[in-house]
Amino acid sequence: MKVLDADTVRSRVSLAAARGAVHDAFCALADGDVVAPDEFAMHLANGGELHVKGAHLGGPYLAFKAAAGAFPEGGNSGFTAVLDAATGAPAAILDDGGWLTEIRTAAASAVSARALARPDSRTLTILGGGFQAAFQVAALREAFGIESVTVWSRSPETRDRFAAENDAVATDTVADAVHGADIVICCTPSREPLVTFEMLSLGTHVIAMGSDLLGKRELADDVLLGADLLVADDVSIAGRVGELAHLAQAAERAVNLGDVLTGRSTGRTSDEQVSVSDHCGLGIQDAAMAQLVMTGGTS
């Protein structure tokens, strides 16, 4: 069994390749061509968490990702285990330290934006100034002709640092950050709504990906009620732990991203529509990244 270190993993996965692989994975999910069990999660008394997600996308490999975080004496860590789909034998350990999770999460946002944002979108707002926020900016710049980026974070130091490192403009309030943005990406651990519908402009596409556990939320109810289009990476999961979990009537009218990508559900039909995409993160994304690495960077 091979062990591929972080440098090797990173050398095999570009932003464009990740976006293509994640796009194909969502389409395969919609087509019913994947095996994707529910996530396994473990929460320890000391605050530490372990999350395991995986899938088989129909290719030569199946994979699962183990991600640990919030431990009091350590940071985030993770690895992906890859097995031969024909024999079940271990094929490789991808010792990426969680990097694949970061890029596959950002790739899903790029896929969502390409499918649902206005094609002429040029302005991007990021709520949150952490490691994932930087991946989001990079992924959206790769997928769109983004001309300006605005960032908000609760910490002035964090948002100023992020702005300097990512060629962005920092703002003091969420309302100022969101105003006039073509695409808004929420990637915070907030447990209280940050964005209200009145903050949004006509035609805005909102991606909420911080609400990946029950209790987290970034969008007020009126955003979910007022949006013309409600999409989730997986409606059933988002209805349990995502933004959609907070409002049953919103979950009832939401559609899966894969169904939009495959034409089963209607996407944006006018430049004035407000669209919302709720992302919890799926095992198919992790399997797609593993497939990329194992095939040398081709989706």
Predicted regions, residues:
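Short helix-loop-beta connector
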Residues: 116-123, 145, 201-202
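N-terminal Rossmann-fold NAD(P) dinucleotide-binding loop
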Residues: 133-134
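N-terminal ligand-binding/catalytic initiation module
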Residues: 1-101, 117-120, 283-287, 294
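NAD(P)-binding Rossmann-fold cofactor-contacting core
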Residues: 142-164
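Glycine-rich Rossmann-fold phosphate-binding loop(s) that bind the pyrophosphate
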Residues: 128-130
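Conserved beta-strand elements of the Class I
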Residues: 124-125, 275
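Adenosine-phosphate binding glycine-rich loop
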Residues: 215-299
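Rossmann-like adenosine-cofactor binding region
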Residues: 168-246
